[in-house]
């Protein structure tokens, strides 16, 4: 999540003024967060609230209203401020810009389960060693 947010902030000044170099400052005073950061935070809240469809809709509308000038596309902005909870036929790539947390949430189990098994084995062995020392 932090990587996505940092990337959004560092890239903010180049969003409409693309550059073709890897030589650019990491820290500038004119950097700012965009709608992608706001909606990434909304996705995080939605996942923490259960990760169901309504959780995502509620969080996106909430965060969109909290940060109305973050740079949303016209259709998304209209959707945020409407009572409509259905898809709004976006032509943009915004959903791709904030989906990283969904993959991270899914990969947690893939990553943790093998590590937990290994950790249990290590702790078991340490416990056996400690018992032998006592």
Model feature map: region roles:
Residues 1-134:
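Structured, active/binding-site neighborhoods that engage oxygen-rich ligands
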């Amino acid at each position: 999540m932090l990587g996505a947010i940092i990337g959004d902030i560092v890239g903010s000044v180049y969003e409409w003024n693309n550059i073709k170099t890897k030589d650019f400052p990491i820290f500038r005073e004119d950097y700012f967060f965009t709608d992608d950061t706001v909606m990434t935070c909304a996705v995080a809240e939605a996942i923490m609230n259960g990760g169901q469809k309504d959780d995502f809709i509620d969080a996106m509308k909430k965060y969109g209203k909290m940060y109305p000038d973050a740079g949303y596309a016209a259709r998304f902005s209209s959707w945020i401020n409407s009572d409509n909870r259905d898809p709004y036929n976006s032509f943009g790539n915004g959903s791709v810009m904030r989906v990283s947390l969904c993959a991270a949430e899914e990969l947690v189990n893939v990553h943790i389960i093998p590590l937990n098994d290994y950790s249990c084995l290590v702790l078991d062995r340490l416990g056996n060693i400690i018992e032998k020392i006592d």
